Amino acid sequence: AIGARALELANAINSYRAQHGLAPIPISKSLTHVAETHVRDLQSSPKVAATCNGHSWSANGPWTPCCYTADHAQAKCMWDKPSELTQLKATGFEITIGQPGETSGVVLDAPKALAAWQGSPLHNDVILNRGTWQSMTWRSLGAGIVDSHACAWFSDQADPTP
């Protein structure tokens, strides 16, 4: 089952999309698992280098670790996580709040997380299929939120997991 906080964040994203005339994205158990796994990893694993951003993954789990840098050289590390961790054999795209191993002191909830993404043009574009993302049709959405970390995952493939 999808946790209440994850569901609240996914529903907030879909409500925001509806305000812009966009269809809701089906909420995915698989992508929610990826998102919740990643927020827990971000919260509990220290940054391995200053250049590693919130798309980074530690070596502390059953996944391929990576230091995700601003040049997107490690994009495949993000894209492959749904296939690594779930039955959803699809490319995943992530928006995040929070750095590895850092706690801001702000306890996020769905409205705060969504507001942060709305205030960032690059993240807002992913949610609303604008710019780089205008040709994508999101067919699955997952979310996770723990303390000062939040993730939302998007894929153009439907989740086969019931």
Q: Which residues fall in each region the model found?
A:
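Functional surface patches built around histidine and acidic residues
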Residues: 1-162
